[in-house]
């Protein structure tokens, strides 16, 4: 769920997902449309696509099982749908960590018209 995703981002990227990624580029935050603005925004695009492929449970509300050890997150549990959500969140948190250097304040709260071009397929 979103709280677990926030905790993964804190663990992997060392920063708050709510503070840093809730309104970034065209894909980080609510909705998503247009072209990803940079590698960080692409993390959110891929995360949105990943959530879009999940069926049978709600990515934003369901609790999943995971453990974290050192700098790694391991998704667990017997429910395949919940494990998929966990893997979407884990991969995005790792992507944020790996692309910290691309984060650019100019993409915070971008005007909606910036994101009106046609979206690329997942």
Swiss-Prot record:
Cofactor note: Binds 1 Ca(2+) ion.
Native source species: Craspedocephalus puniceus
Disulfide linkage: 26-115, 28-44, 43-95, 49-122, 50-88, 57-81, 75-86
Active site: 47, 89
Binding site for Ca(2+): 27, 29, 31, 48
EC number: 3.1.1.4
Protein name per UniProt: Acidic phospholipase A2 Tpu-E6c
Protein family membership: Belongs to the phospholipase A2 family. Group II subfamily. D49 sub-subfamily.
């Amino acid at each position: 769920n979103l709280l677990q995703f926030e905790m993964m981002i804190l663990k992997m990227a060392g920063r708050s997902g709510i503070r840093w990624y809730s309104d970034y580029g065209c894909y980080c935050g609510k909705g998503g449309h247009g072209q990803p603005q940079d590698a960080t925004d692409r993390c959110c695009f891929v995360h949105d696509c990943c959530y879009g492929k999940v069926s049978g449970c709600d990515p934003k509300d369901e609790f999943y099982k995971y453990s974290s050890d050192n700098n790694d997150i391991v998704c667990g549990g017997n429910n395949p749908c919940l494990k998929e959500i966990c893997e979407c969140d884990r991969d995005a948190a790792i992507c944020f960590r790996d692309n910290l250097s691309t984060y650019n304040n100019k993409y915070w709260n971008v005007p909606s018209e910036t994101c009106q071009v046609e979206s690329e397929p997942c």
